[in-house]
């Protein structure tokens, strides 16, 4: 199963279902299917989500893709992304990874016949 380390402060947002996407730059490629998030501050904490879509777009278009353009204007988006990727620019292509919440993932898995 693909896995991805996630900043400790973001981990509860995934668990609660508030965070349903991640934006990656120059990282291993994600693909639709199960994905395990691993909390960077405590690697014993993990949660599985179902990746539903992966799309490559310039960073300047990523906020609109996930419906956050009102709260993530370019300046805010660039500042936030530079906390993780200091050299990133608005015209750099990023991978936007969208996924179900953990609860939706469990329900989707339970609905599959083995």
Ranges and model annotations:
Residues 1-114:
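Structured alpha/beta reader/binder surfaces that contact nucleic acids or chromatin modification marks
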């Amino acid at each position: 199963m693909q896995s991805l380390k996630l900043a400790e402060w973001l981990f509860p947002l995934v668990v609660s279902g508030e965070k349903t996407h991640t934006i990656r730059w120059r990282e291993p490629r994600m693909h639709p299917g199960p994905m395990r998030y691993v909390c960077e501050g405590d690697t014993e904490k993990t949660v599985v989500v179902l990746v539903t879509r992966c799309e490559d777009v310039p960073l300047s278009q990523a906020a609109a893709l996930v419906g956050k353009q009102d709260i993530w204007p370019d300046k805010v988006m660039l500042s936030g992304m530079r906390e993780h990727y200091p050299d990133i620019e608005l015209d750099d292509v990023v991978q936007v990874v969208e996924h179900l919440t953990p609860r939706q993932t469990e329900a989707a898995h339970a609905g599959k016949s083995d």
